[in-house]
């Protein structure tokens, strides 16, 4: 499937949650998580990122990190239950990457879902667009 983006910077191939995290299902069954373009826009210039620990078992909607900007601090939530299998080690040293490339190099962590079927029930790009309009 070709990657497409809605006019409001919401890639159509990803899944979303109302707390403004995006999810991408990888070929190995893990899920990459980051904050959306909308979230980084609301936050402004991001100056600090705290990520979860590799090996942490997170419940869906459990706080998994923190993002601080010049305007505000915001919690990051696990959009799906599972075990953290990787974190973006480059992000704490270059938190502005979450602003400049939120769907690419600005990813936060990868999680091995406790129940892979949970991914299917998350918001589509169109549904998420309805949440932020």
UniProtKB/Swiss-Prot annotation:
Record keywords: Lipoyl
| Origin superkingdom | Bacteria
Q: Which GO terms describe its cellular component?
A: cytosol; glycine cleavage complex
Which InterPro entries does the protein's record reference? Biotin_lipoyl, GCV_H, GCV_H/Fam206, GCV_H_sub, Single_hybrid_motif
Q: Name one Pfam family in it.
A: GCV_H
Which Gene Ontology BP annotations are present? glycine decarboxylation via glycine cleavage system
Relay the cofactor remark from the entry: Binds 1 lipoyl cofactor covalently.
Task: Indicate where the modification N6-lipoyllysine is found in the sequence.
Answer: 71
Domain named Lipoyl-binding is located at 30-112
Cofactor section: (R)-lipoate
What is said about its interaction partners and assembly? The glycine cleavage system is composed of four proteins: P, T, L and H.
Q: Which family does it belong to?
A: Belongs to the GcvH family.
Q: What does this protein do?
A: The glycine cleavage system catalyzes the degradation of glycine. The H protein shuttles the methylamine group of glycine from the P protein to the T protein.
Q: Which NCBIfam families match?
A: gcvH (TIGR00527), PRK01202.1 (NF002270)
Which protein is depicted? Glycine cleavage system H protein
């Amino acid at each position: 499937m070709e990657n497409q983006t809605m006019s409001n910077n919401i890639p159509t191939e990803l899944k979303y949650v109302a707390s403004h995290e995006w999810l991408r299902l990888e070929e190995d069954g893990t899920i990459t998580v980051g904050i959306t373009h909308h979230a980084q826009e609301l936050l402004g210039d991001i100056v600090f990122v705290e990520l979860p620990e590799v090996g942490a078992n997170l419940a869906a909607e459990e706080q998994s990190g923190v993002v601080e900007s010049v305007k505000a601090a915001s919690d990051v939530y696990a959009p799906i239950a599972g075990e953290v299998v990787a974190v973006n080690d480059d992000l704490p040293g270059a938190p502005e990457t979450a602003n400049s490339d939120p769907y690419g190099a600005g990813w936060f962590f990868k999680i091995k879902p406790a129940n892979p079927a949970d991914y299917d029930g998350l918001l589509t790009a169109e549904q998420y667009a309805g949440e932020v309009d």
